[in-house]
Regions:
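Canonical Radical SAM [4Fe-4S] cluster-binding loop centered on the CxxxCxxC motif
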Residues: 44-87
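Conserved, mostly hydrophobic/aromatic
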Residues: 12, 35, 64, 105, ...
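Core AdoMet radical
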Residues: 72-164
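Short, charged low-complexity intrinsically disordered segments located at boundaries
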Residues: 33-37, 60-70, 155-157
């Protein structure tokens, strides 16, 4: 059954709940070999690197115990508002020249203000037109319209931290 599941995944088909539950009891070594077979099919021996820039630092209202950006803890991180377009462009160009395939602006906070989001859209539009690198984003919670705006200016992937 494990081989059948591997083939389904490689063929781009979903597995059923029953098949997923089957994987719980598979020998760990066999499971690792199956996962490696899937990885080799989709990725070969390459990896996809996304470099990030801390586009806005500190003063986050969230209370993530591990995070130095939270206002709930005294840390020594630099606190600053959204970086200027030229600073972000310089870092994106540097990464592209180093062979990095993806670049993401990461901002602290649950949300960006409307003004900050508009500025981010301008920055991504600028990068998309001038820097040969795939664009990603990690900007907190967004609505559908904001996701569509990011997509329209060339953002291909969205990173999200899911904490339990």
């Amino acid at each position: 059954m494990l081989e059948k599941i591997v083939r389904q995944i490689i063929d781009g088909r979903d597995i059923s709940r029953k098949e997923a539950e089957f994987l719980i009891d598979v020998d760990l070594q066999q499971l690792k070999q199956a996962a490696n077979q899937i990885r080799e099919y989709f990725c070969g021996n390459d990896f996809d690197l996304c470099s990030i820039i801390n586009g806005k630092s500190g003063r986050c209202s969230e209370d993530c115990k591990y995070c130095g950006q939270s206002i709930h803890y005294q840390t020594k991180i630099k606190v600053y508002d959204l970086l200027e377009k030229e600073i972000i462009e310089d870092i994106a160009v540097y990464n592209a020249n180093q062979g990095v395939g993806r670049f993401s602006i990461v901002t602290s906070g649950r949300y960006l203000s409307d003004e900050e989001f508009s500025k981010i859209i301008e920055i991504y539009q600028y990068l998309n037109n001038r820097v040969k690198i795939s664009l990603c984003a990690s900007l907190g919670l967004l609505n559908l319209e904001q996701f569509n705006e990011l997509k329209a200016v060339g953002v291909k992937r969205y990173h999200n931290n899911l904490e339990t």
